[in-house]
Amino acid sequence: MASHLFTRSRISLLKTLKPNPFTSASPIRAISGTPFLSQDPLLATESTDHDPSNHQSTSTPLPPNPATGSPLYQENWRSPIPNTPSFNQSLVPLGFLNQAPAPRIRALSETLDMNSLLNMFADWTASQRWSDMKQLFEVWVRSLDKNGKPNKPDVNLYNHYLRANLMMGASAGDMLDLVAPMEEFSVEPNTASYNLVLKAMYQARETEAAMKLLERMLLLGKDSLPDDESYDLVIGMHFGVGKNDEAMKVMDTALKSGYMLSTSVFTECVRSCVAKGRTDTLVSIIERCKAVDRNKSLCPSWILCNYIAEVAIQEDNSKLAFYAFEFMFKWITRGEMARPSVIFSVDEGLVVAGLASAARTCSSSLVEGSWTILKQSLRGRKAANPASYIAKINAYASLGNLQKAFTSLHELESAYADSEKEVVEEMLSPFTSLYPLVVACSKKGFETLDEVYFQLESLSQGDTPYKSVAALNCIILGCANTWDLDRAYQTFEAISASFGLTPNIDSYNALLYAFGKVKKTFEATNVFEHLVSIGVKPDSRTYSLLVDAHLINRDPKSALTVVDDMIKAGFEPSRETLKKLRRRCVREMDDENDDQVEALAKKFQIRMGSENRRNMLFNIDYSRGRALNN
């Protein structure tokens, strides 16, 4: 009743302070249309003006709430990591989810033991909750356990704390400051602890501090010894700032200790050595890696392998080229074993260059390695190009392995037996492509020539006879190089008599060259007339050799006659042939023939050039010089 009176008096006071000017004559009505609370409540009468059923026919309904039926709808779909973690598998009560972050972390620090905290940190590491991890650890170490004693972390738990600080951008100095208090908890830093510090140094490229820390780890020993990751971080750090020598020293230490290098560090080392031209250093590193079983599987990328091979071939480093081809062979093998298979094929031009480098460096291993990877790349689907076979023949010839050289020649002839005759003759010419084999056959004079001839003769009488005109032509030309006309002529006759073969144009050219070299121009002319009479078509080299035979005999006029015949046959004289002719005309003081040579040079638009330097040497008065010296 008192409250009712207080309300009535308050209303009357409001009426006195704020009268209604519009209804001053009328009695004052209460603002509320509802009775006082002490009376029984009445149900409000529903107004037909606000009935939603009246508007359903004229308005479009809203779409359903998208959050219904999908508990994951509230998560931020723009972030791969949800902001609200799931505690379905944790020991945290579900009531903590609605608390503020700080009280929740404080409550967790009071309820979780070390093992539970380790499990939670593992979950938070997966979700990258570094800030919560750092905050919870700092609160947890200041809390008491269930026995009322301060919580003490072990090294694994502390490493989680270090990782959280590292991921939050802590500097190397901050990381060192965080490692120092580990002694207060009776915890010794292990290798993983120092590796986290090294990662911070790696980001800041602090090489000197990293080297000191690495030395400290080596001195501490036991659980603090550096591992593979430690050396990778330090080596990669030095390569990143361009300190390649220091990186090589650390890598040398790691390899001597038997540590395993990562593929990235090995690739960076290879790239650095190749870029600076330190191929010998790279060979040494590769050999040390191959000596350790754990590092045998290291292999640069396919593109880098090609680059290594190119640089090694340019510098004629046969060992490095062999290792590059070995790496490529690994890639080809891995690609074939993969499902689906990945096809790798080496460039055949690179193999040819490798064989040429093997010939220059006399490396048998590079010859075998180059040919092996070429066969692996071709996969038996087609034969190698003639240039590859010829490069292989020349490589074995430079090594002095004539047996394998002639075996490769037999492979070339078998692979291209169905080719056109002109193509085969040009491909197997002893004057051009097979000339290194000719030089190898005549290296020791008649001793080597006779040995090769008897081997070919025995092969022609075997179960699978091998008869080759190209091989015999090499012997004929080799005899001509040693001025052994008798052996050259006997070998030429043996082509048809002993081997049952027909001499080709290269056979006649080699014999003609042998006669011309010993100044038997008449016999050389007879050889030319003989081959023309039996229907063998001479080539441009035949005429050039006949010109040389006349010039050796100091007969420029006859040589010019041969040149005229050469032009009539449809060939053009070479610049070298015309220069030889002019030189002989000058020395013989034959101005008439010299003018004809100049006319031929103008006709075929050949620039002869001057021979002042040759003439100076030719006109030196050596007898006067001796008289002055005496």
Swiss-Prot record:
Q: What is this protein called?
A: Pentatricopeptide repeat-containing protein At1g26460, mitochondrial
Q: Which GO terms describe its cellular component?
A: mitochondrion
What spans are recorded as compositionally biased (Polar residues)? 67-77
Spans of PPR repeats, please give: 154-189, 190-224, 227-261, 468-503, 504-538, 539-573
> Transit peptide residues?
1-115
Listed GO MF terms: mRNA binding
Subcellular location field = Mitochondrion
Per the record, the major location class is: mitochondrion
Q: Which family does it belong to?
A: Belongs to the PPR family. P subfamily.
Which keywords does this chain's UniProt record carry? Mitochondrion, Repeat, Transit peptide
Q: Where is this region: Disordered?
A: 42-79
